[in-house]
Amino acid sequence: MKENEKIIMEKGIHTDFKENMTYGEYLQLDSLLSSQKRLSDHHDEMLFIVIHQASELWMKLILHELYAAIESIKQDKLQPAFKMLARVSKIQSQIIQSWDILATLTPSEYIEFRDSLGQASGFQSYQYRMIEYALGYKTPHALKIYEKDPELHARLHTALHAPSLYDVAIQALVKEGFPIHKDVLNRDITQPYEEDATVEAAWLEVYADVKKYWNLYQLAEKLIDIEDWLQQWRFRHMKTVERIIGHKMGTGGSSGVSYLKRVLDQRFFPELWNVRTKL
């Protein structure tokens, strides 16, 4: 037996899987790897599909971690939440790199299969919408996009009505004794969050006395990390779109780059940014 064959067939490596689960079976690779179905015969459409499917898988993990972190904070278990939120940031950094790969798609290549997309657009990504909802950017009007699928629409409806990460972070301030205005605590959580002076004052006190409020300070910084990464993702999205289609209208009907530039101004945790100026 050749030396390289000896390495591959090292003693103890399992080779008989007639009655045992394989790696491919555990990951359901047959199903996963058969889901890349091009609607054109253009070579580069495969790149487009794989990039977006991979991003959706990462977003599934982001939601898994965000929901667990929200429940953990509700139960006053901040330390486990820190680990989950730190993982979200790492996932975000990974997704951002995918834009570098998609940017290898030139305008001439994309135009060859763009019409195959019809009105399908990343704007319709329900997982991205759920991430926005989980972070507190609620857009009730967007639910109409998902009416085609009643089960999916119900999931989005549930996500819209659930407390966001920032909602439970503000509740953590209340539990620590900070006086948060009742309008914030009793607000309609299906609507976008609007910044509040009492919330800002609370975070300002947290940042002014880090030792006393260490856990709240750590929570605040984890939130800033997530929003920072999300804004970087949005910027790379906008520049990649501009690089590939310029200022054409998006397939989903948006104004394309102009819309993506406006989105950059959306904030999830406004008071946490404001305190940096006031410290």
UniProtKB/Swiss-Prot annotation:
Cofactor annotation remark: Binds 1 heme group per subunit.
Spans through the membrane: none
UniProt GO MF annotations: heme binding; metal ion binding; tryptophan 2,3-dioxygenase activity
UniProt pathway: Amino-acid degradation; L-tryptophan degradation via kynurenine pathway; L-kynurenine from L-tryptophan: step 1/2
Keyword Chloroplast applies: no
Catalytic activity: L-tryptophan + O2 = N-formyl-L-kynurenine
Residues annotated to bind heme: 237
Function, as annotated: Heme-dependent dioxygenase that catalyzes the oxidative cleavage of the L-tryptophan (L-Trp) pyrrole ring and converts L-tryptophan to N-formyl-L-kynurenine. Catalyzes the oxidative cleavage of the indole moiety.
HAMAP family: T23O
Protein name: Tryptophan 2,3-dioxygenase
Species of origin: Bacillus cereus (strain ATCC 10987 / NRS 248)
Gene name for this UniProt entry: kynA
